[in-house]
C-alpha cells in the first residue's frame, strides 16, 4: 500500500493532530501534525517502543532527561518505559512519522 504522507497532513488549532496511517497486529504507524507552539506532553509506554522520523519542520524532542532538536531527515527512538514528548518550537508545521511497536491495546 502506497501512502502520500504529506498529502494527509492537517493541523488542528487546539492540539497536535494524530493521523492513523497503517496498523498491523505488530505495529502502528501514525503521522503527527504539530503546529508552532503545540506539544505532546511527556509520557511513557510500559510495553511499546516508539520511533520518530521528522519529515518536515523542526522540534524539540524529550527523551528521558535529555532534549534533542530534530529536523527533517532526523530520527529518534524512545524505548519502552522511557519518558518522551515533543514540542514544535519552530515557526512552521512539524510533521513526524511515528511507529509504535507493539501497538497499544486500544489500537
Spans of model-derived segments:
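Short acidic-glycine-tyrosine-enriched beta hairpin
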Residues: 66-80
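Ligand-binding loop in jelly-roll beta-barrel domains
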Residues: 80-105
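Structural motif
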Residues: 28, 58-60, 67, 83, ...
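A short, N-terminal "cap"/entry segment at the start of jelly-roll beta-barrel domains
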Residues: 1-30, 41, 77, 107
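Short strand-connecting beta-turns/loops that link adjacent beta-strands
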Residues: 25-26, 47, 91-92
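Histidine-centered divalent metal-coordination motifs
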Residues: 43-45, 84
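Short, conserved beta-strand element in jelly-roll/cupin
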Residues: 33-35, 46-61
Amino acid at each position: 500500500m502506497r501512502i502520500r504522507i504529506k498529502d494527509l497532513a492537517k493541523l488542528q488549532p487546539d492540539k497536535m493532530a494524530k493521523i492513523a496511517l497503517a496498523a498491523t497486529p505488530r505495529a502502528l504507524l501514525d503521522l503527527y501534525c504539530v503546529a508552532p507552539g503545540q506539544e505532546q506532553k511527556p509520557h511513557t509506554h510500559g510495553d511499546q517502543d516508539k520511533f520518530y522520523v521528522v519529515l518536515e519542520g523542526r522540534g524539540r524532542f524529550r527523551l528521558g532527561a535529555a532534549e534533542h532538536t530534530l529536523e527533517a531527515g532526523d530520527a529518534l527512538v524512545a524505548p519502552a518505559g522511557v519518558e518522551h514528548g515533543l514540542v514544535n518550537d519552530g515557526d512552521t508545521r512539524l510533521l513526524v512519522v511515528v511507529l509504535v511497536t507493539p501497538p497499544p491495546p486500544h489500537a
